[in-house]
Amino acid sequence: ALDEGEDMISNDVVLRIIGPYGGFGLYEPSINGILSSCSGWATSARDCVKNSGEIPILSRISKYVHPNVAEMADYSAVVGGAVQCSTNLGARISNTTSFDTMSGSLSMLFGYAVSAAKA
């Protein structure tokens, strides 16, 4: 099996579960979903890091995923090389700091970005 953050090559074993299928088969779809989503997020972050040169990559993925998986998406992005993430829990489990930006809709509500920032 692979260690966390290690590059995957086609046909690599990424997780090995030993035991009767009846003991874990019920969880197979969830395990597959977690592995495929997390590896996809980490791979995307790694691609960004490789192509960014010296520019640090910050993960804002929490804006685009369901809130129940936002911290795992952030954690996966940090595993892939992002230096910060946008959820407090994602930052805690990845031992980084969180950051965020002001919502564009907040600026629209106030009519002007400076007014929204002051609020």
Placement of each model-derived feature along the sequence:
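Buried, small/hydrophobic-residue-enriched core segments of structured protein domains
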Residues: 4-8, 15-119
